[in-house]
Amino acid sequence: MNEPLSELQQRAEDLEYSELLDAAALAPARSRERLLLVAAFAVSAYCGVHRTGKPFASLLGETFELVSARKGFRFLAEKVRHAPTPINRAHASGRAVWTFDLEDELRVRLAASSPGGIDLAPAVLVRVRFDDGDAYR
């Protein structure tokens, strides 16, 4: 059963705990405190994995924009490729001078060893950058 969200809207949920990035931006560059806050933000993306429904597939060229005045960030996502493997890209920027870039791709391959003969491997690359030059992947 599908849930009433698109893939792109679901990606915006990764910023549910963006206040961790706001706090990390205020921490000293290359400090353990910043690393800890960025790691906590990375783990927070798993808060939505309990769902059993799948999101609606976005159409090629479809975009989704979310501006959260309460949390102080702007998020923009687009489906940039549909076949042979779907790719979504997203960018967000926050008031505390951080940026968040995401690219996700669902790699599909035929594999006799997998149940059903299809092997699905999601590949997600996330980059977080701060205005002082610190960057995390």
Q: What would you call each of these model-derived segments?
A:
Residues M1-R137:
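Extended acidic, Ser/Thr- and Pro-enriched interaction/regulatory segments
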